[in-house]
Amino acid sequence: MTTTEETTQLELYFQQFRKNIIGVNQEFVSPFGKQKLIYTDWTASGRLYRPIEEKLMNEFGPYVANTHTETTISGTAMTMAYHQARNIIKKHVNANENDVLITDGTGMTGVVNKFQRILGLRIAENLKEFTAIPKAIKPIVFISHMEHHSNQTSWLETIADVEVIPADAEGLFCLNEFKKLVEKYSDRSFKIASITSCSNVTGIKTPYHEVAKIMHQNNGVCFVDFACSGPYVEINMHPDNESYLDAIFFSPHKFLGGPGTSGVLVFNKNLYKNNVPDCPGGGTVSWTNPWGGHKYIDNIEDREDGGTPGFLQVIKTALAIQLKEKMGVQNILDREHELVDYVFEQLESVENLTILANQHKNRLGVISFYIKDLHFNLGVKILNDKFGIQTRGGCSCAGTYGHYLLHVDEETSNDLICQITSGDLIKK
């Protein structure tokens, strides 16, 4: 079975990897009979890869042990594998000696929230009414109009002010509007741009290195969310001395072979000002005594790795990254362009079907559409039952971007909010 009408050289190249995806030939019985499962929900999560699962089971499995010891063969093996995996991750994103790697949670959401706590931007909800921060020292965060909720709502719950950078007339990231906002808040002492590298709804990319350059010229910092694009693009934290990224976060579970991994955060250690780790516990202290005395480890990565680390998760992340590198980023992008062109050609001929941001075909392989007078969940169910296609409906955790794409004005938005609040979840 071919993905396009004619098998291309790239399709033939990727067959060697595709055949090892667990479930690639899976079938199930729907109301319409036996269907072959066709997975197209990669933007949400990747798929298990048999060689990685077998390597974890057969090569690492026999030596699984806690990493907090190096006096046994098992403890030493896991500790060495854990540290080697961390080095693989750092090298993949072109981190330098000043960058710190932290893994946490199950994806980008966990690490961006942890990072906000590390930066001292989160306070307990019951203490907010007692906290008054002068405007001059209140952080300002700039986000794009295309953010996933994780890189929007999490910032809204910090002590910072948050500004959405207006899109340009074509619905793209607008550097001119961004510069205006930076100038507007030039008096703020802590300026942050936290933007997605690519929309998880349309696959449209942002000029994040240019954003970083502008932030650095204005004494600010730039954080980039690679959750959507990470499995497919080069991640380069240090392309030059001006456009470097101060922090990145991504979700390895979206990689081929990545489900079951932790979120990844890499950031410049100069942003770390803390004496106390975010998660004090085992492995974070040099010593304690019965009288309340204690000293935390100086090394930031060790100090912020409290408790038994997710060593298998980190090892699996490194294996998924090595698989990405073996496939080749340019091969991945070239194949994505083939598929995007093919899907556009086929869907644009379907009556009453509208591709969102269809004027922008220069994108990663993320395509969202709606069908006139058809509820999205019914559409997803039909695709599943009739054709075996695995996808998802709804706003894809990007409700703000949905307003832009569907031209939802404030009055319509408020009406929808009222209906949803009253329990009419079909409108959601």
Regions found by a protein language model. Give the residues of each.
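Pyridoxal 5′-phosphate
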Residues: 1-428
